[in-house]
Regions:
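Extended, charge-enriched "interface" segments that sit outside catalytic cores
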Residues: 195-202, 214-215, 237, 259-261, ...
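Short conserved micro-motifs at the rims of enzyme active sites and ligand-binding pockets
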Residues: 121-124, 163-165, 189-198, 223, ...
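C-terminal structured subdomain/cap of oxidoreductase catalytic cores
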Residues: 224, 239-292
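Acidic, Ser/Thr-rich peripheral helices and adjacent loops at domain boundaries
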Residues: 189-222
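Single conserved hydrophobic/aromatic residue that forms the stacking wall/gate
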Residues: 1-4, 9
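Generic long, charged, amphipathic alpha-helical segments
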Residues: 217-229, 233-234
């Protein structure tokens, strides 16, 4: 049926599903083919492996792909329970991040995936990390006297190289990059140009950037001099498969959780999101005064 058509609205129980919590009014409705439930306490940024992600991914790619995605996430979750730090990559990554933030004083982290398929992944991690650990009070509601979550930003590798890498290499602030790279292209066919594949060229750029950040380059011309000494980390996979994607998501979710433990934060609420929503409703209801009225008038609301 055509979305919005009378027939579609009348027969939506044959064409639509609901993903909701069991306490939602949707859970008791007969207007949907099926309802899939998620727990009330699961925030959107942690919902990729819940019914929210399952419904979308299964419809788009099939249930087998979603099953592989879950398998990769589950395997990474199992590693997060390891007591041996050398076998627990999420914990190790979390502690490196805490050291960079609280000991070295770096306020930002750049996430740099060398795969166009992960072009929106830095934006997801931006929400995951900053919404979870961008807090100034601990889980007991007490103000903290130390810095917490960093600013997260990023772009796919070679795009970033021709934009903000300049600041990462020669800027006055040190921003630790976190690279994500894969040995093999997820596409079965790759092109060979001048003796190397496109994937090999991507990997060559990753290796070059890591060494450039660490070692720098001396030059009599200060404008061409690179101080080096800029730390970075890298996550390497064989190929970006559904299982690898699930593992990657799980890795960063556990990393954020571990950092929340260290900083004694509640990484699973987002009170900072609510204030803007409340004020926006006041603006639309014209219940405003002071600065809120000034900006409402300025924007002709």
């Amino acid at each position: 049926c055509l979305v919005g058509s009378e027939m579609c609205i009348r027969d939506r129980s044959r064409h639509m599903i609901a993903v909701t919590s069991e306490t939602s009014p949707l859970a008791k409705s007969d207007d949907y083919l099926a309802a899939f439930f998620m727990d009330d306490y699961i925030g959107g940024r942690y919902s990729s492996t819940s019914a929210v992600g399952g419904a979308v991914l299964s419809l788009a790619f099939g249930p087998d792909v979603f099953a592989q995605f879950l398998k990769g996430a589950a395997e990474e979750d199992a590693l997060a329970k390891e007591k041996d730090l050398s076998k627990n990559p999420a914990m190790l990554d979390a502690l490196i991040g805490v050291y960079e933030r609280n000991v070295l004083g770096y306020s930002d982290t750049a996430v740099l995936p060398y795969s166009q398929a992960l072009s929106r992944f830095p934006a997801h991690l931006q929400q995951l990390d900053m919404e979870s650990n961008g807090k100034s009070v601990n889980r007991f509601g007490e103000p903290v006297n130390y810095v917490t979550g960093p600013v997260i930003f990023g772009e796919p590798g070679t795009n970033g190289q021709h934009s903000f890498y300049q600041l990462l290499h020669q800027g006055t602030d040190i921003v630790p990059p976190q690279f994500v790279g894969f040995k093999n292209n997820q596409m079965e066919k790759d092109v060979v140009i001048q003796g190397s594949t496109s994937q090999q060229k991507l990997c060559a750029n990753v290796a070059a950037q890591i060494v450039a950040f660490a070692c720098g380059k001396d030059d009599e011309d200060n404008n061409k001099k690179f101080e080096g000494g800029r730390p970075s980390s890298i996550i390497i996979g064989e190929k970006l498969t559904p299982a690898a994607m699930g593992a990657l998501l799980s890795h960063f979710e556990n990393k954020v959780m571990f950092q929340g433990f260290v900083w004694n934060l509640n990484s699973f609420d987002q009170e900072g999101v609510q204030l803007g929503k409340v004020l926006a409703k006041r603006v639309l209801a014209h219940e405003i005064d002071g600065a809120l009225k000034v900006y409402s008038d300025l924007l002709n609301i």
